[in-house]
């Protein structure tokens, strides 16, 4: 089982990635959330220049953030810095679009975007739509050595719904999933395997990564400790955000969360301006717990929705994930909580 990290891009994120590489982590995944973080490719380039082994992936690139030729150029430029260590992770958009009041893109738009980016990275001439007109484009002088389209850049799709998983099985080299409750994570990887079989490809040929937040609890430490709240707590409000904005089907809401979601909704309705409440809702998304959200981040929810448990418990979860078909667990490093890297590295050594 590989262990990776996920992180919010910043100009000093390379320090975390360099530290992760020294500790044996296999991958570093960078969020593409332009209204919250620094530019994803700036952060990745700095990390690429200061590391030599760790794989660097966009986790995930959002098509509406940049046109396909620009994305292909950024990936190929990064590949010049870190040949063979770049992964093109992409999806229809969650945080990057919600922070601007937008929902996810259409799968058809994602498919087209991926088609163009991959063709350009192969060195092909490809037709794409630019400003309402179909145009033929290609990299004109890759032989100049300014970019690298020689070393392959694998495609990993983040896919949570059946149609997205079918697309992943059809075109991708890897699948990215966000895991909270272990039984659900195991069910979802089986559904991904079924999609692979339906697409007539062996499930083992698709590299599967589960992303999460969590905390390796020390002896006698509670899930409500300050350390656990800092490392894992930021995921809990995002669950409320998802139900509130209907990113997640409300039918999936556990009955016991009903009162808390109602209270969170009442709080949300106080946000201003009324036509852009998302501006306050998503401030610090997955990076911290805002003061008004603290009361919703209970020890019970931290345990239920994140990978927060003792090392022994987490070891069994990871082994169950590996047995089910996951090849990597990627844990987000919350800003200011980089010391968690040593905890997860110690756990990885025992799995």
Where are these regions (language model features)?
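N-terminal beta1-alpha1-beta2 module of alpha/beta enzyme domains
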Residues: 1-58, 153, 334
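Active-site mouth loops of central-metabolism enzymes
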Residues: 1-11, 61-69, 149-160, 214-218, ...
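Hydrophobic faces of well-ordered beta-strands that scaffold small-molecule active sites
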Residues: 3-7, 28-30, 56-59, 86-90, ...
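Conserved, mostly hydrophobic/aromatic
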Residues: 24, 47, 78, 117, ...
């Amino acid at each position: 089982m590989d262990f990776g990290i996920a992180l919010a891009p910043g100009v000093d994120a390379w320090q975390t990635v360099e530290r992760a590489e020294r500790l044996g982590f296999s991958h570093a995944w960078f969020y593409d959330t332009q209204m919250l973080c620094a530019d994803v490719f700036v952060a990745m380039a700095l990390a690429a220049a200061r590391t030599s082994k760790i794989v660097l992936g966009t986790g995930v690139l959002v098509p509406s953030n940049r046109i396909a030729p620009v994305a292909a150029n950024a990936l190929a430029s990064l590949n010049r810095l870190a040949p063979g260590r770049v992964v093109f992770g992409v999806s229809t958009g969650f945080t990057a679009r919600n922070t601007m009041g937008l929902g996810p893109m259409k799968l058809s738009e994602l498919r087209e975007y991926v088609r163009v980016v991959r063709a350009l990275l192969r060195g092909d001439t490809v037709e794409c739509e630019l400003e309402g007109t179909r145009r033929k484009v290609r990299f004109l002088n890759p032989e100049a050595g300014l970019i690298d389209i020689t070393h392959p850049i694998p495609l990993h799709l983040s896919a949570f719904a059946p149609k997205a998983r079918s697309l992943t099985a059809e075109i991708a080299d890897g699948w990215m999933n966000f895991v909270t409750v272990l039984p659900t994570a195991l069910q979802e990887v089986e559904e991904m395997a079924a999609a692979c079989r339906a697409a007539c490809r062996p499930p083992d040929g698709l590299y599967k990564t589960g992303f999460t937040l969590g905390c390796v609890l020390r002896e006698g430490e509670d899930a409500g400790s300050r350390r656990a709240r800092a490392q894992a707590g930021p995921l809990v409000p995002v669950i409320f955000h998802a139900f509130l904005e209907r990113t997640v089907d409300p039918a999936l809401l556990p009955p016991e969360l009903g009162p808390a979601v109602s209270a969170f909704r009442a709080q949300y309705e106080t946000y201003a301006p009324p036509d852009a409440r998302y501006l306050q809702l998503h401030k610090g998304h997955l990076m911290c717990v805002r003061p008004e959200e603290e009361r919703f981040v209970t020890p019970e929810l931290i345990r239920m929705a994140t990978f927060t448990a003792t090392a022994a418990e987490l070891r069994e979860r990871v082994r169950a994930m590996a047995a089910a078909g996951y090849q990597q667990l990627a844990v987000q490093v919350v800003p200011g909580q980089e010391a968690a890297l040593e905890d997860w590295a110690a756990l990885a050594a025992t799995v």
